[in-house]
Regions:
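A short, N-terminal "cap"/entry segment at the start of jelly-roll beta-barrel domains
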Residues: 1-56, 71, 141-150
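Conserved short histidine dyad/triad with adjacent acidic residue
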Residues: 44, 58-76
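Short strand-coil-strand connectors
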Residues: 55, 92-96, 119
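Glycine- and acidic-residue-biased ligand/ion/polar-headgroup-sensing regions
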Residues: 77-89
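A cytosolic small-molecule/anion-sensing beta-strand core signal
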Residues: 85, 102, 120
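Structural motif
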Residues: 88-90, 97, 113, 123
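Short acidic-glycine-tyrosine-enriched beta hairpin
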Residues: 94-111
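Ligand-binding loop in jelly-roll beta-barrel domains
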Residues: 110-136
Length: 150
């Protein structure tokens, strides 16, 4: 079993008492602004709430206001799968573009460029899979530009 000690004592955007737990009550957690370290054209367009963190996975809920977009980018250390919970977005993955509606799911593999434009206020649940087992360290680096508290 994963223990809080094996994961460290800090996960960006996650309450420290939830680290390594089998059940995390999302309803008592607040969303926080994310300013990714790959951000150049964006101003922290997502508000995120980490729902679960393990050595290989980060699961979070993200809200993006209508009209906001990130620049085309890729991740060298993880794959992502997202479930569109609310709102519509235009998702470009590699050379393909999709209009994603509530209930749709999409995947952007590790190393594949992608961009996400919100056509309406939108909420997605995203799972990031880190095959090397460095999920928490990588997530904390990604969120390094954000104003967050431990």
């Amino acid at each position: 079993m994963t223990t809080p000690e094996s994961l460290g004592n800090f996960v960006a955007f996650m309450d420290s008492t939830d680290i390594g737990q089998l059940f995390v009550p999302s309803s008592k957690r607040e969303m926080r602004q994310l300013v990714p370290d790959y951000s150049q054209d964006e101003d922290g367009v997502d508000r995120v709430k980490v729902l679960m963190a393990t050595p290989n996975l980060i699961v979070f809920e993200a809200f993006r206001p209508s009209g906001e977009t990130d620049r085309m980018h890729m991740h060298k250390d993880h794959h992502s799968v997202a479930y569109q919970k609310e709102g519509r977005v235009r998702m470009t993955i590699g050379s393909e573009t999709f209009e994603v509606a509530p209930g749709d799911t999409y995947h952007h593999p590790m190393g594949v460029k992608h961009r996400h434009k919100s056509l309406e206020d939108s909420v997605r649940i995203e799972v990031k899979y880190y095959p090397e087992g460095n999920a928490i360290e990588s997530w904390n680096r990604l969120a390094a530009g954000s104003n967050q508290s431990k």
